[in-house]
């Protein structure tokens, strides 16, 4: 295919893609800021420990490490089990495309009054002994479940990941957290024995609608969007653009979803597509 050359180099660039984020915390009507750069294909809980350490310097009434924190954008809790880049494309990129002067993504950190369990997955595990929230344990459980789901779609069975040795399972998790591309690729190949169908999730910016479906590996991106989002993918809806990993992939409409998945899949082996109306 002409549009996707130098696959390894492109994958490396995607792996190293990052987003500038400004985290705000309102403490007694005083706004405290924290700036960071976070990889697109990582997850927000990986930076929770450093947020807690920083903001604890300004809080004396509570131990932040012992209460679950969460992040919000425009008062909407962020689903932390989604990759950072997917959240960015779905929630923030549409506004940025219309106003290039918006700057970095600004979101708020919360720790009270009540964790919004009706919107986002709660953190129920705690570290033994000191009562601190164990964010990594919960994230491990959720991401491994997502990998099992994608493994089932890809292989027609979840056996490849279920049959990983304990050592390989732990190494896979460490490669996700440390973002070791080499180790991740080696271990991920053990999960993907065959490619039966492609695990795809389609998000529509500005809408709560999410389309999740196993897709035939031979279908094109255009065929998939026409089938699952016909109102946004018809010729009369030419202003709807598909974004993957922050990139407008309109030029790849006639490529097979398998080729696109091989290039753009996330750490959980799902292909996340965001439709943005421009």
Swiss-Prot record:
One of its GO terms (biological process) is aggrephagy. There is a cross-link at residue 148 (Glycyl lysine isopeptide (Lys-Gly) (interchain with G-Cter in ATG12)). Keywords: Autophagy, Isopeptide bond, Membrane, Protein transport, Transport, Ubl conjugation. The keyword Iron-sulfur does not apply. One of its GO terms (cellular component) is Atg12-Atg5-Atg16 complex. The keyword Transcription regulation does not apply. InterPro entries: Atg5, ATG5_HBR, Atg5_HR, ATG5_UblA, Atg5_UblA_dom_sf, ATG5_UblB. It is found in: Preautophagosomal structure membrane. It holds the Pfam family ATG5_UblA. Its main location: membrane. Conjugated to ATG12; which is essential for autophagy. It is a peripheral membrane protein. It comes from the Eukaryota. Coiled coil: none annotated. Belongs to the ATG5 family. PANTHER family: AUTOPHAGY PROTEIN 5. Conjugated with ATG12. Involved in cytoplasm to vacuole transport (Cvt) and autophagic vesicle formation. Autophagy is essential for maintenance of amino acid levels and protein synthesis under nitrogen starvation. Required for selective autophagic degradation of the nucleus (nucleophagy). Also required for mitophagy, which eliminates defective or superfluous mitochondria in order to fulfill cellular energy requirements and prevent excess ROS production. This is Autophagy protein 5. It comes from Candida albicans (strain SC5314 / ATCC MYA-2876).
């Amino acid at each position: 295919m002409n549009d996707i050359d130098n696959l390894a180099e492109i994958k490396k660039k995607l792996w190293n893609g990052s987003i500038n984020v400004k985290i705000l915390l309102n403490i007694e009507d005083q706004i405290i800021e924290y700036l960071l750069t976070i990889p697109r294909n990582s997850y927000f809980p990986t930076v929770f420990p450093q947020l807690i350490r920083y903001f604890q310097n300004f809080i004396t009434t509570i131990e932040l490490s012992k209460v679950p924190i969460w992040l919000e954008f425009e008062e909407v809790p962020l689903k932390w089990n989604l990759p950072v880049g997917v959240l960015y494309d779905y929630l923030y990129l549409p506004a940025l495309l219309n106003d290039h002067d918006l700057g970095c993504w600004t979101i708020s950190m919360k720790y009270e009054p009540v964790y919004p369990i009706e919107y986002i997955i709660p953190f129920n595990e705690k570290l033994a002994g000191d009562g601190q929230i164990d964010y990594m344990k919960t994230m491990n459980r959720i991401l491994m479940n997502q990998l099992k789901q994608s493994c089932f779609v890809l292989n027609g069975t979840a056996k490849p990941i279920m049959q990983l040795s304990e050592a390989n399972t732990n190494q896979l998790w460490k490669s996700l957290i440390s973002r070791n591309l080499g180790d991740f690729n080696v271990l991920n190949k053990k999960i993907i024995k065959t490619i039966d169908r492609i695990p795809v999730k389609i998000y529509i910016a500005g809408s709560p609608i999410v389309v999740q479906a196993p897709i035939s590996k031979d279908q094109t991106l255009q065929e998939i969007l026409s089938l699952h989002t016909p109102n946004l993918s018809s010729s009369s809806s030419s202003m709807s653009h598909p974004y993957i990993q922050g990139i407008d992939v309109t030029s790849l409409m006639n490529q097979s979803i398998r080729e696109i998945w091989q290039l753009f899949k996330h750490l959980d082996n799902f292909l996340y597509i965001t439709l943005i109306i421009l």
